[in-house]
């Protein structure tokens, strides 16, 4: 893989971002995927430094004040941010980097790093997105309703992105993302 630098992947909750990124990493372990910091508590099975860097609100605020994030935003009542130093180190070393972040974070990265490639992952249909979110069985109807309200806003913003990938098949979506990352 010839690295093109930084690729930012965004899309609504339930569209399959984690699954597509995992498929990319499975075939291309040389792609570095940023580990975000968050104030949300770890879920069962999550390990600090693997899925997220888990920090308390005070530490997160300190990191924001110190300029340690490329982007940061509130989502679902918790703060999330992309640590600046590891990203810049990998980019300087020529490592292809992938950020999987939400819309507000993507907008911040576009302001700070406009040379990045911005990719929006979209569901085949809104009904399919509803099916995926409800099929998880992990969230209350109220949380799902909030996520769907947010998804409508995010879907309306897809024109802000350089490319749109419809995730109707994980392997195809991952292959398309890799093709965009290497510029083919």
Swiss-Prot record:
Coiled coil: none annotated. GO terms for molecular function: ATP binding; guanylate kinase activity. The keyword Magnesium does not apply. Keywords: ATP-binding, Cytoplasm, Kinase, Nucleotide-binding, Transferase. Residues 4-182 form the Guanylate kinase-like domain. Transmembrane segments: none annotated. It is found in: Cytoplasm. ATP binds at residues 11-18. Gene3D superfamilies: Guanylate Kinase phosphate binding domain (3.30.63.10), P-loop containing nucleotide triphosphate hydrolases (3.40.50.300). It comes from the Bacteria. Its main location: cytoplasm. PANTHER family: GUANYLATE KINASE (PTHR23117:SF13), GUANYLATE KINASE-RELATED (PTHR23117). Essential for recycling GMP and indirectly, cGMP. HAMAP family: Guanylate_kinase. This is Guanylate kinase. It comes from Frankia casuarinae (strain DSM 45818 / CECT 9043 / HFP020203 / CcI3). The gene is gmk.
